[in-house]
Amino acid sequence: MKKILQLIKQRSITRKLLVSFLSILIIPVVILAIFAYQSASSSLDRQMMGSALENVQQLNEIINTSIGEKENSADYFSEWLTKEKYNAKSNASIAEKFSQYISINKDVESIYTSDTKGHFTRYPDLPMPSGYNPVERDWYKKAVANKGKVVITDPYKTASTNTMVVTIAQQTKDGSGVIAINMTIENLLKTTKKVNIGTQGYAFIMTKDKKVVAHPNEQSGTELKGDWLDKMLSADKGDFQYTMDGDKKKMAFDTNKLTGWKIGGTMYLDEIHEAAQPVLHLALIVLAAAIIIGIIVMTLIIRSITTPLKQLVGSSKRISEGDLTETIDIRSKDELGELGKSFNNMASSLRSLIHAIQDSVDNVAASSEELTASAAQTSKATEHITLAIEQFSNGNEKQNENIETAAEHIYQMNDGLTNMAQASEVITDSSVQSTEIASEGGKLVHQTVGQMNVIDKSVKEAEQVVRGLETKSKDITNILRVINGIADQTNLLALNAAIEAARAGEYGRGFSVVAEEVRKLAVQSADSAKEIEGLIIEIVKEINTSLGMFQSVNQEVQTGLDITDKTEMSFKRISEMTNQIAGELQNMSATVQQLSASSEEVSGASEHIASISKESSAHIQDIAASAEEQLASMEEISSSAETLSSMAEELRDMTKRFKIE
């Protein structure tokens, strides 16, 4: 990497741009091509593995369907076959049942049974090899050993027809024999051979003992070999990659639960790579086209950059040789065009600068001569300044003595003002306290006025209530007078009634008694009314007495209100006068404080003037020394002016090498 960077650094800008553009163009396209190829390969891999799994599952379902039907049939016959049927004189009923079953199930090669004594019945009835004993056969032994459970044998060739079959066997329910069904695997072989995974991939079925059940390239019953078989037998289902006969393959497998057979679907990895090749070829074509188009575009871009740069390099060389009349013509509107304009502006600025330098050189030469003459005049003026400073220093010392005397008098005046300010502050504080006390008294009087008003209002309300009682009492008196009149009339009526009753004789006696009772009640009512009237008269007298007292209280309350109003006004005037006095005292205190502060400022200013005067004396002495130093400096300036004049001549000679017109 370091070598590549060093090579780029040593090359021209054209090659640097070319390498940079090609890197930016090629690297992303190459990465995109690789990614597209890998993505296509992964997608094809998933599709083919999905197809393999689907085919494996279909074969598994076919096995379940075929074997499941035969298991159901075996279970049916194991219950139908009994010891009585085996011991019958003829097995015609068994043969007829088997014939019906064979006619319905075309994938059954034969169905047969044997009891424990070896009596064998089969349909179709084909000749068996000599010495054939069904009780010694594996299918019989396995069925008896599993006691009523269905057993499935590995594929084998029958002794009678040499056909590859699978036997499904089961012991009868009463244990008197075994029923067995030979199912051909021809349909399973055809279905397996029809399965295509990709173009070369295939499916197969094998037993747990690695023997072929169905395989497009191997005979049924053949034992398969290879390390990859252990991966299939170590798990119920899954997928893995393996190598067989130098070919890289990938397999998906599953296990049939009824038989324990392994069902596998294998595909060649080369097919995935071959299927993904068109994607890679297309990516390479796109890469080549992109590179060609990119080179054309890059060439135009690089030329648009390098051509103005070459013009700038040539013009820069001529300017470095002193030719400031050089200009550059770049018409592009990009950064290079701006650079060309800036370059021309720089050349113009340099020309102006050289003009200015030449003018300045002439001015410097003339100024140096004037400076030499001015230095001589300044030296003479400095001598006069030195004499004047000495005279000023003597007068300044007398002024310092006068300032110190004035400062002492100001200090004494400042002490008096300070004492006056403190006294005025004490008086002001006392006035403020008086104002606060007067204000509190005014508030108390105001509260008293409010309370007196409340009392006045209550007295007036009570007076109104008593007057109402007087009116009601008079009304009651009038009512009692009416009652007395009624009682008198009732008494008179009772007398008249008694007289009339006496006249009536015996008939009016009862009425006479009633009239007497009425008269008595009238007399009692009149007496009670008189007593009530007497009480009412006394109440009216008491009410009149209360009214007189209320009027007296009301007058006293009014007198108290007038007095409290006058007192409140007096407190207000006291408070206002006290506030006015406090304000005046505060103004006086502020004035005294201002005078005190002003005297302090004057005192400070006097001290400051004295110190400045002393400093001025010291500075005057320093100025005198500086004046002497200035005389020496003027001599150095005169020498420097001569040197500056010679340097201006040298600078004029240097600017002559530049061509500006």
UniProtKB/Swiss-Prot annotation:
* Record keywords, A-Z: Cell membrane, Chemotaxis, Membrane, Methylation, Transducer, Transmembrane, Transmembrane helix
Q: Which residues lie on this side of the membrane: Extracellular?
A: 38-281
Q: Which residues carry this modification: Deamidated glutamine?
A: Q593, Q594
PTM field: Deamidated by CheD on Gln-593 and Gln-594, producing glutamate residues. The glutamate residues are then methylated. Other additional sites are deamidated and methylated as well.
Residue ranges constituting the Cache domain according to the UniProt record: 152-228
> Which processes are annotated in GO (biological process)?
chemotaxis; signal transduction
Localization, per the record, is: Cell membrane; Membrane raft
Task: Please report the name of this protein according to its UniProt entry.
Answer: Methyl-accepting chemotaxis protein McpA
Give the source species. Bacillus subtilis (strain 168)
Gene behind this chain? mcpA
